[in-house]
From Swiss-Prot:
Residues 23-365 form a propeptide. This is Bone morphogenetic protein 3. It comes from the Eukaryota. GO terms for biological process: cartilage development; negative regulation of ossification; osteoblast differentiation; positive regulation of transcription by RNA polymerase II. Residues 336-345 have a biased composition (Basic residues). Induces cartilage and bone formation. The gene is BMP3. PANTHER family: BONE MORPHOGENETIC PROTEIN 3 (PTHR11848:SF144), TGF-BETA FAMILY (PTHR11848). Disulfide bonds join 373-440, 402-472, 406-474. Homodimer; disulfide-linked. Residues 68-97, 261-300, 321-358 are annotated as: Disordered.
Length: 475
């Protein structure tokens, strides 16, 4: 009986050790753990179309969550909610404003060498490469090294040597099946052991800069090992990938967000939602809507709220426009009263009658409503504009907008510029006819991180400036 208990304790201890080692295997590369976007973690949006076991997607989701101020790290740390820690603020991107990921395509052979081919045609001329890193998986090599018996030409000394990884980069030309050596690199993988890091990385910034300067965007990498008697060829699984940090000089140009997010010609048309399905089914209704809404939308062209023109009119205008008639006391007329008694209920006046006090309250309530320049709420849903098919996260964001009047005299809260102040005075004096009042425009704006697929189905993270209105002013 005692022997059985001893064997049971020994088995349980071995099981705990193996579980602890397996947990350590996932610790050295924290950026490659599964990352859940903030909108999915909160249940505010649909699940991401990314594959759950795809290391490239996990890495990009992690970066997005970090630079968009998500709460993934906070949610994983126990006790944060109890301590009442504030929500994470978006961090500035480490380098530039763009992170592009490139996954290896179908492997090819070049002079009996296996190449992992990358298509880098998504890089634009305006994107200046700041840094580039190649990530590759070597777990299979470690397993072979640790399981190699001494009898199969794997000496004890060879097993303890450092693993040396050789990387050779090739430029693949589409014409004539030509190839050109781009460069050689080596990586010291360290000594193989049970909790060895499964992923290694190597800086390839200079290689990609050289290829981009020569406008060569089809690159192949051959990954081999040396320094011991193990097989030279290594086939990493999962496939390697590249992360490129770049600074897009054209991201602040007009309509840059439209040109980069809407230019997805290769996406299947059936997957993109059709925005004009309702207008095709009911064209007459659409025409009636356009005619009816034309007058309503006109004030918005001048940064005015609908109905704002009533604020600055005199009381006579209200008297002309009001639909109600005030009650006026008149001397009693017996003949009229007799006639009114003869009328049936169908001949009663259809105009509602209110006293003067009720009308004054309604008039005062309308004047109290905020009509000055201010920030108004606006939520943009990418599904409404047909972009949800390739935008991974966020599915929607709070954009806000500025609207309202900048009439003289403007209070300090509207933060008018000197030019806006002078313009409002000139308009109020009326010396120069036709001078409009200053406009209500955004004063401060913040950026927005967007994670999306490019035309080659690679995951891209871009930080677009001036996407959310923080405050408004008169200019």
């Amino acid at each position: 009986m005692a022997g059985a208990r001893g064997l049971l304790h020994l088995w349980l201890s071995c099981l705990c050790v193996s579980l602890a080692q397996g947990q350590r295997l996932r610790q050295p590369f924290p950026e490659l753990r599964v990352a859940v976007p903030a909108d999915r973690a909160a249940g505010g949006g649909p699940e991401s179309p990314l594959q759950p076991l795809d290391q490239v997607s996990e890495h990009m989701l992690r970066l997005y969550d970090r630079y968009s101020g998500g709460r993934t790290e906070e949610a994983r740390t126990p006790g944060n909610s109890e301590r009442g820690s504030p929500s994470l603020r978006p961090q500035p991107l480490r380098e530039g404003n763009t992170v592009r990921s490139f996954r290896a395509g179908a492997a090819g052979m070049l002079e009996n060498k296996e190449l992992h081919i990358f298509n880098l045609t998504s890089l634009t001329k305006s994107e200046n490469i700041l840094s580039a890193t190649l990530y590759f998986y070597i777990r299979e090599l470690i397993n072979i090294s640790l399981s190699c018996p001494v009898s199969q030409e794997c000496s004890h000394h060879a097993q303890r040597k450092h693993i040396q990884i050789d990387l050779s980069a090739w430029i693949l030309k589409s014409s004539g099946n030509q190839s050109q050596l781009l460069g050689h690199l080596s990586v010291d993988g360290g000594k193989p052991h049970r909790d060895f890091v499964s992923w290694l990385s190597k800086d390839i910034t200079q290689l990609l800069r050289k290829a981009k300067e020569n406008e060569e965007f089809l690159i192949g990498f051959n990954i081999t090992t040396k320094g011991h008697q193990l097989p030279k060829k290594m086939t990493p699984s999962p496939e390697p990938y590249i992360l490129v940090y770049a600074n897009d000089a054209a991201i602040s140009e007009p309509e840059s967000v439209v040109s980069s997010l809407q230019g997805h010609r290769n996406f299947p048309t059936g997957a993109v939602p059709k925005l004009d399905s309702q207008s095709r089914s009911a064209p007459s209704i659409e025409r009636r809507r356009r005619k009816r809404s034309t007058g309503v939308l006109l004030p918005l062209q001048n940064n005015e709220l609908p109905g704002a023109e009533y604020q600055y009119k005199e009381d006579e205008v209200w008297e002309e426009r009001k639909p109600y008639k005030t009650l006026q006391t008149q001397p009693p007329d017996k003949s009229k009263n007799k006639k009114k008694q003869r009328k049936g209920p169908q001949q009663k006046s259809q105009t509602l009658q209110f006293d003067e006090q009720t009308l004054k309250k309604a008039r005062r309530k309308q004047w109290i409503e905020p009509r000055n320049c201010a920030r108004r709420y606006l939520k943009v849903d990418f599904a409404d504009i047909g972009w949800s098919e390739w935008i991974i996260s966020p599915k929607s964001f709070d954009a806000y907008y500025c609207s309202g009047a900048c009439q003289f005299p403007m209070p300090k809260s509207l933060k008018p510029s000197n030019h806006a102040t002078i313009q409002s005075i000139v308009r109020a004096v009326g010396v120069v006819p036709g001078i409009p009042e200053p406009c209500c425009v955004p004063e401060k704006m913040s950026s927005l991180s967007i994670l999306f697929f490019d035309e080659n189905k690679n995951v891209v993270l871009k930080v677009y400036p001036n996407m959310t209105v923080e405050s408004c002013a008169c200019r």
